[in-house]
């Protein structure tokens, strides 16, 4: 993340995210608040949002792959520096690459001034 970017979402960003990608709220998510990503979307790290955007894009692009479950993890490596590790599985490398690029473009458009 750029030094100027926020590290955590807020209510306004959460509303914009859910307006653009309503299915994010229903993603399963291991967290301390509840069973879905919607429980934490208004106060979670931007890398965590990125993880779920990538997963969501892959689910939509791979709708014909009915036996695949997409999972991911996110951890800060250095929050002050904006460095995080985000890992997601994938079924198709080109679809995954597109999902990563689209998620980055979307987040940059939302948070980079």
PLM feature spans:
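M16/MPP (pitrilysin/insulinase) zinc-metallopeptidase core fold and M16-derived inactive scaffolds
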Residues: 18-95
């Amino acid at each position: 993340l750029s030094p100027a970017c926020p590290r955590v979402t807020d209510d306004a960003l959460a509303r914009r995210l859910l307006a653009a990608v309503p299915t994010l709220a229903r993603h399963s998510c291991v967290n301390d608040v509840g069973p879905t990503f919607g429980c934490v979307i208004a106060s979670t790290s931007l890398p965590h949002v990125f993880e779920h955007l990538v997963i969501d894009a892959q689910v939509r692009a791979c709708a014909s792959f009915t036996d695949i479950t997409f999972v991911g993890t996110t951890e800060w490596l250095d929050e002050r520096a904006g460095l995080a590790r985000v890992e997601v599985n994938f079924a198709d490398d080109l679809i995954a690459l597109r999902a990563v690029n689209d998620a980055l473009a979307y987040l940059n458009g939302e948070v980079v001034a």
